[in-house]
Amino acid sequence: MFDENTPGAKEELFAWLRHMNKYKGSDLFITTNFPPAMKVDGKITRLSDEPLSAEKCMEIAFSIMSSKQIEEFSSTNECNFAISLPDTSRFRVNAMVQRGATALVFRSITGNIPKFETLNLPPILKDIALRKRGLVIFVGGTGSGKSTSLASLIDYRNENSFDHIITIEDPIEFIHQHKNCIITQREIGVDTENWPIALKNTLRQAPDVILIGEIRDRETMDYAISFAETGHLCMATLHANSTNQALDRIINFFPEERRNQLLTDLSLNLQAFISQRLIPREGGRGRVAAVEVLLNSPIIADLIRKGEVHNIKEMMKKSTGMGMITFDQALYDLYENGDISYQDAIKNADSAHDLRLDIQLRSRRAQNAGPDLELI
C-alpha cells in the first residue's frame, strides 16, 4: 500500500488541477494507460503525452485520501470526497476501480458564480427567481449547465431579496456567500447523513427558498411538492432532455393509483420547467446555452392536470408573449444572432425538419448567406 501522504504524487496532481482551473476546465481525469486529461468546453484535452500507470493512479489516489477513505475505497472500490487547493478551488472527487485499476474524476466546484447576464438566460428567469412560492425545476443532461444556471438564479435572489435560502446537495456544486440573504448549504454525507433526513428537517429551519440538488426518486419529488404547497419556493434539478421528458419522468416516479393526484398537485404548484443544452459557439469560442422555458398558465395547468403532456409543446410555441420558448425557437434565435452554426442548430433540434423549414422561410441570416449556406 502506498503512503497516503506521498508528496510527489499530490504536488503533481495539484499542478494539474491548477492548470485545469487556469483554462476553465470542468473535470480532470486520472486513469490507467492514458495521460492525465481535462475537459474544456465539453472536449477532452490531454495534459501530457505520457500515459499513467496503474501504480501511479493508485499513488495519486492514496495521496489525497484519509485513512478512513483508503479503508472505504479498499473495501468497496468506490469513494466520494472533496479536496481543496489554497486560493484556488474545491473539487469533488470520485475514486473508482475500472478494469482492476484505480481511476479518479475531479469536478471543479467554484465560488465564482457566473452572473445571470453572462449565461444567455431568458430575462423571464429573473422574475421566476423572485417568486414567493411554487416549484421551479431545471432540466438537462449531465454537463448541460443546469447547475450553473440554477446557481446563478440563487445568486440573483441572494442579491435582490432578504430571505433564508437552504440548499441540499450531493455534492455542493457552488459556494454561495451571504449577501442580502442567509444561505445555508448542506452536503449529503458531510453536513447531514442522507436525503430523507435532510429533507424531513428542512421546514424546521425556517426557509423561504429550498434548493434540492437533484430529484432522483418519488420520495424527493414528494418533498419538493410539499415544500411548494406550504408556501415556499422550491428549486431543483432533474435529469431529462426536455420539459416534456421531465414531466414524463416525474409521472413515472409514481404508481398508477397516485398519478391523478400528482398531476393535480403539479398543475397547482408548478412555476416553471427550464431545460437547457450547451451548444458550441460558431468559430470554437466556447459554448452557449439554448434554453427552453415552460411557464405555468391556466391552459398549461389544465393540460398537466389531464396528463396531456404531448400537447404542451404546441401550446408553448403559441405562448412566446408570456416568456415561454421551445428548444427549437431558442436554437433559431441563437443561429439568427450568429452565436451558433446552421449545422449545430439542426443537429440539436427537437425537430430538425421544422427548424430547417423555419430557417428557410424566416431567417435573414440564411437569406444573406445565399447559396453559400448548405441547408442540409
Q: Could you describe each region identified by the protein language model?
A:
Residues 1-376:
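Short, flexible helix-loop junctions that flank or precede catalytic/ligand sites
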